[in-house]
């Protein structure tokens, strides 16, 4: 696969879980002889939700919740066939969303 690039984008709510998954991908890619650019931390998306505490009158009493979505980007430059096979066989955690673009 000459002059190709694999771009892997990972998303997770837990940043520790995300960093361990990124480490596994980088180790696998380097072990098979590909060059790796990254991991590049992308901006964290924070979704905030404001909910009334009580079911009735008190509009002033509210509770706030937030969900943080952490993201990382990895570019694998000059991937070999062994790199692609190893990445396909890699078993990552259930809480990590992986998007792969060739």
Swiss-Prot record:
Belongs to the universal ribosomal protein uS10 family. The gene is rpsJ. Involved in the binding of tRNA to the ribosomes. SUPFAM superfamilies: Ribosomal protein S10. GO terms for cellular component: ribonucleoprotein complex; ribosome. It comes from Citrifermentans bemidjiense (strain ATCC BAA-1014 / DSM 16622 / JCM 12645 / Bem) (Geobacter bemidjiensis). It comes from the Bacteria. Keywords: Ribonucleoprotein, Ribosomal protein. InterPro entries: Ribosomal_uS10, Ribosomal_uS10_CS, Ribosomal_uS10_dom, Ribosomal_uS10_dom_sf. GO terms for molecular function: structural constituent of ribosome; tRNA binding. SMART domains: Ribosomal_S10 (SM01403). Part of the 30S ribosomal subunit. This is Small ribosomal subunit protein uS10. GO terms for biological process: translation.
